[in-house]
UniProtKB/Swiss-Prot annotation:
It comes from Drosophila sechellia. A lipid is attached at G251 (Cholesterol glycine ester). Keywords: Autocatalytic cleavage, Calcium, Cell membrane, Cytoplasm, Developmental protein, Hydrolase, Lipoprotein, Membrane, Metal-binding, Morphogen, Nucleus, Palmitate, Protease, Segmentation polarity protein, Signal, Transferase. A lipid is attached at C79 (N-palmitoyl cysteine). The keyword DNA-binding does not apply. It comes from the Eukaryota. Gene3D superfamilies: 3.30.1380.10, Hedgehog/Intein (Hint) domain. This is Protein hedgehog. PROSITE patterns: INTEIN_N_TER. Ca(2+) 2 binds at E144, E180, D183, D185. SMART domains: HintC (SM00305), HintN (SM00306). Its EC number is 3.1.-.-. Interacts with shf. The lineage of its organism: Eukaryota, Metazoa, Ecdysozoa, Arthropoda, Hexapoda.
Amino acid sequence: MDNHSSVPWASAASVTCLSLDAKCHSSSSKSAASSISASPETQTMRHIAHTQRCLSRLTSLVALLLIVLPMMFSPAHSCGPGRGLGRHRARNLYPLVLKQTIPNLSEYTNSASGPLEGVIRRDSPKFKDLVPNYNRDILFRDEEGTGADRLMSKRCKEKLNVLAYSVMNEWPGIRLLVTESWDEDYHHGQESLHYEGRAVTIATSDRDQSKYGMLARLAVEAGFDWVSYVSRRHIYCSVKSDSSISSHVHGCFTPESTALLESGVRKPLGELSIGDRVLSMTANGQAVYSEVILFMDRNLEQMQNFVQLHTDGGAVLTVTPAHLVSVWQPESQKLTFVFADRIEEKNQVLVRDVETGELRPQRVVKVGSVRSKGVVAPLTREGTIVVNSVAASCYAVINSQSLAHWGLAPMRLLSTLEAWLPAKEQLHSSPKVVSSAQQQNGIHWYANALYKVKDYVLPQSWRHD
């Protein structure tokens, strides 16, 4: 059987490609006919314009296909961090221990749930921002009888609903129990996110305390910004404010962070240019030099919250919370990619060995946070980059290195096709041409398009929310 006959979009793509080729050929023929009497300079400029038009059409077609294709896959064929497309493999989840918090930071830091914004009362203007949660898979104790325990911020509701589903999967017949959410009676001291609807205390419906360590872990996986196994009687979870600027939208490094060029020179990311070959990493963890093909985000003035990862070898990586960082799993001898704000102390990251030049695991000994000026997100052809000697992905927000790399395929194709353009040298020789790095200020249009479409084609569990 012909493969195209069973895949409708493949036939459509073939027809579109043929149509595109015909248009380019027709355009080329007309251009050739009209240029018989034209000067050599005019013919050269027409050839350049014609080649760029065909290239633009082809790139648009490939980009459209790669955006549409994910919609045709069932979410059941999901992929975990760094495992590529295919069958989902369950990963081991370890329960939290009593008094453990994730992240291991103060609840009110920017890398956790963020600062307090003020008590919300029933007569407060912000009270209308609280939303009721009527999820039938969640039990609400509601001791006050006012329905206050059902009120919470939008983000808290989203995470709680995800957790409720996880609880039913983990323990069939057991439901999530919420013992406290928004509090209007000041039962939690002077400072508490309960007063803002950004915190919940939870347990399981059977009150089995042996489950609470795993319940806390499930809360972390559900996306709560700060989780504490605070007591043997319950778990405490909180989230960032709905009104806060989302620090996880972008995946970037600081401009002062450095990359190693193929020449052996270290260069600040803020000074990198398209075409620079920097130290990167292959899919199997080998060091390799790869070309910078674009900047997914570049803004030297923007203030941003960053996570800082300190290793026992002295390396320090400063990166935004939603950025993927390579993590070595010694038990399974596998390399995975994990969101920076979910890396914990004792996790192992890959760091360049000064003597051998190879990437070796080093243990994370400290996880901190910092607010700094400027963001830079270079994209290499390999999809990875070694920054401050620590191996990291070029991608963020989506918890799969392979899926994100696949999504940027049109940009790699465009870069390759541009290198084949016969007029490339002539165009670049013009004194008016400025490097893309100098021109760009903000998010690259293609990266921005992918970010917007992800909410429609990817399940929430695949995203950093």
